[in-house]
Design a protein with these regions (language model features):
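Bacterial Sec-dependent N-terminal signal peptides
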Residues: 13-55
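Generic hydrophobic-segment detector
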Residues: 8-12, 26, 312
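Sec-dependent bacterial lipoprotein signal peptides
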Residues: 1-18
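Short, surface-exposed polybasic-aromatic patches that bind anionic ligands, especially phosphate groups
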Residues: 39-382
Length: 382
């Protein structure tokens, strides 16, 4: 059998049109109308040497929520939730960080944003499947990912190396651009997530400087145990990145990760973070702790704001689910699912069309950052 890639016409149409009006509720690559855990439309495309592509049914799977239904990632923040007593102080700090670092909040796409490769290791086929517009890569060969000491720690973390044994990395996968070179693999067959930080291939062998593995993700709250995971807080990319499918669908149904420039010292952080890379040697008062959650004031009329379509989608998610501080960066920023996740399957980079060709640093122009509200420390901790 000669397998060929059939790209969803629905998905391409959504990307071409900017994708913010919602997708078809049926068809081989329909984009789900909700982030709830529903059975997704799954198809596989294949052809013989002389025939037309034929759909091959596979087990229905939902990509919308890979962690426990009780995960903080998926729990809306009630409108009457208590606020942090330092909320207004933290909001002023956030505004100062934005103003003094380029005056904007960037949407990272190709750099400092992890690709997420969804794979199936028991697919029984070498055809790419499509689940609600997301490519699912069949992988028949597992590889061991080695450790390389990019931070000159002088030791090998053997427990981490053990977690990186037998990783189903699809052929042709690439990590993100930029110095962090992040990469995520999610195996739908086993509900296992791997993350890698500063990832590279040397003589055909994969290596990474840090990361981790989460098994049985449907039973996990969406937090790597200390000290694992590729973000500074141990919060996985797959929980808080924004996907092209979500923007095409017009709705984000989870909390969003946000990176700040400055944060409270490493020993002061909030659940759900399991650690922090904050650095405050001069003991500046009232720094925002990593792991803390914030939301856009739910009383703001988002539809009345002069926002881009994507900015409006993000603002509504910020009201309902909020942001969680998961990392530090050179500018305040959010992460999209890296377009390498789609390009491996033959799709173009979806973000220029979804952003209506607006630069990534201008997509959130007009966002009401002054209306952010910070939640109490350890908000929502079981």
């Amino acid at each position: 059998m000669r397998h060929v890639l059939i790209v969803s016409a629905v998905f391409l149409l959504l990307l071409t049109n900017g994708g913010c009006g919602g997708g078809s509720a049926s068809g081989p690559s329909a984009i789900a109308a909700s982030g709830d855990a529903v059975a997704a439309t799954v198809t596989s495309t294949a052809s013989d040497d002389g025939g037309s592509p034929t759909a091959v049914a596979t087990q229905a799977t939902s990509l919308s929520r890979v962690f426990s239904p009780r995960s903080f990632w998926y729990r809306p923040i009630p409108a009457d939730a208590p606020l942090n007593p330092k909320s207004s102080i933290y909001t002023q700090d956030l505004l100062h960080q934005i103003k003094t670092h380029y005056g904007t909040v960037n949407l990272n796409t190709t750099s400092f944003a992890s690709p997420i490769y969804y794979v199936q290791t028991n697919a029984g086929s070498d055809a790419v499947n499509w689940v609600d517009g997301t490519p699912i890569y069949p992988v028949g060969k597992r590889v061991n990912v080695g450790f390389w000491d990019c931070q000159n720690k002088g030791r090998t973390p053997h427990e981490l190396v053990e977690q990186w044994r037998g990783v189903p990395i699809p052929a042709g996968a690439t990590p993100a651009n930029g110095s962090d070179s992040e990469m995520s693999i999610y195996d739908l067959s086993t509900h296992t997530l791997w993350e890698f930080w500063v990832t590279r291939r040397v003589d055909g062998e994969w290596q990474a400087c840090w990361g981790g593995r989460l098994r049985d993700t449907m039973q996990n709250p969406g937090i790597f145990p200390h000290p694992y995971g590729a973000t500074a807080t141990g919060l996985p990319f797959i929980g808080g990145e924004i996907s092209a499918e979500e923007l095409a669908n017009g709705k984000i149904n989870h909390a969003i990760g946000i990176a700040l420039v400055n944060a409270a010292n490493w020993d002061e952080f909030s659940w759900p973070a399991s650690r922090s890379d904050g650095y405050n040697p001069n003991h500046a008062p009232d720094r925002i702790p990593e792991g803390i959650r914030m939301r856009l004031d739910p009383s703001v009329d988002v539809d009345a704001l002069n926002l881009t379509p994507v900015g409006r989608i993000i603002a509504k998610a910020a009201q309902k689910y909020g942001f969680v501080v998961w990392d530090k960066a050179g500018a305040v920023s959010l992460r999209m699912v890296n377009p390498a996740s789609y390009e491996l399957a033959g799709l173009p980079n979806p973000y220029p069309a979804l952003f209506d060709n607006v630069a990534s640093y201008d997509v959130l122009k007009g966002f009401p950052w002054s209306k952010m509200q910070f939640m109490p420390m350890n908000y929502g901790k079981p």
